[in-house]
Amino acid sequence: MAAAPLKVCIVGSGNWGSAVAKIIGNNVKKLQKFASTVKMWVFEETVNGRKLTDIINNDHENVKYLPGHKLPENVVAISNLSEAVQDADLLVFVIPHQFIHRICDEITGRVPKKALGITLIKGIDEGPEGLKLISDIIREKMGIDISVLMGANIANEVAAEKFCETTIGSKVMENGLLFKELLQTPNFRITVVDDADTVELCGALKNIVAVGAGFCDGLRCGDNTKAAVIRLGLMEMIAFARIFCKGQVSTATFLESCGVADLITTCYGGRNRRVAEAFARTGKTIEELEKEMLNGQKLQGPQTSAEVYRILKQKGLLDKFPLFTAVYQICYESRPVQGMLSCLQSHPEHT
């Protein structure tokens, strides 16, 4: 007897979550392995007097977070989280990283023990012993195997079906390949590697570097300076991974889409860079710019810089990561934006 088709739930419906919903919704129509209806949990909001779930289910467009891109009709928006995840075999987590504890607490026990997850969340958390990966939190709270997906994937370009690559990291290769089957398209090409922790760290740390790149753009430093930010930022990413990853760190992972490719595209095209440039030019706070420029969505780079700063301070390692430290201090401790340049000039990579 054929196995029952696998039910998919997307936990999150922002810009990236909606772009991924478009891919999954279209793919499951063609693949008998997966159930034809995809549930998507939506944090309910009112847009122009209508519930966002009603707009998505009737107009098949997330007009707030992914306007201009139609979602497949088999993607069903649900505002009740417990109802959305009920009986799901595959969970795709794509929410701001600061909400992961609450979300996991709410759904633990409501999904089958055999369920598998994949996190597209770019961020880290602090634990009592220092670094805690988002995948670790999900794994510990829910008791399910969890893969990660990170790459050079600007959501609007993915939704427009422009070619890109991405990386899945999975400690159980079979599970990583299952998610590749669910997500891959001719224009969304996926490589699966087993160095999952490094893949996940790349996705979080590159946002800090992108903030630094945005500061340089705001100061009109030029492309040479931005290239230095990218190179030095990559060096700090590798050093951080070697210190804090539990398993072996493969330098080759940084050459995948999750590494240098994602770093480049985020430092040139991402919203962390864009908001950081505005921060440098206007003097407004990060919070003010989030409201003005991101439609209320949260920026991951500054928050991740704060978490990384506290982890490094706890371990007495701040002097080894001057770029990460400078981004935090400029965002939160009123250090002048020009401090980004002095950080580059005195970086230990040059001694």
From Swiss-Prot:
Its main location: cytoplasm. Gene3D superfamilies: N-(1-d-carboxylethyl)-l-norvaline Dehydrogenase, domain 2, NAD(P)-binding Rossmann-like Domain. Its EC number is 1.1.1.8. NAD(+) binds at residues 12-17, 155, 271, 298, 300. The active site is at 206 (proton acceptor). GO terms for biological process: carbohydrate metabolic process; glycerol-3-phosphate catabolic process. Substrate binds at residues 122, 271-272. GO terms for molecular function: glycerol-3-phosphate dehydrogenase (NAD+) activity; NAD binding; protein homodimerization activity. It is found in: Cytoplasm. The keyword Oxidoreductase applies. It catalyses: sn-glycerol 3-phosphate + NAD(+) = dihydroxyacetone phosphate + NADH + H(+). GO terms for cellular component: cytosol. Pfam families: NAD_Gly3P_dh_C, NAD_Gly3P_dh_N. It is an enzyme of class 1 (oxidoreductase). Signal peptide: none annotated. InterPro entries: 6-PGluconate_DH-like_C_sf, 6PGD_dom2, G3P_DH_NAD-dep, G3P_DH_NAD-dep_C, G3P_DH_NAD-dep_euk, G3P_DH_NAD-dep_N, NAD(P)-bd_dom_sf. Keywords: Cytoplasm, NAD, Oxidoreductase. Belongs to the NAD-dependent glycerol-3-phosphate dehydrogenase family. Plays a role in regulating cardiac sodium current; decreased enzymatic activity with resulting increased levels of glycerol 3-phosphate activating the DPD1L-dependent SCN5A phosphorylation pathway, may ultimately lead to decreased sodium current; cardiac sodium current may also be reduced due to alterations of NAD(H) balance induced by DPD1L. Interacts with SCN5A. This is Glycerol-3-phosphate dehydrogenase 1-like protein.
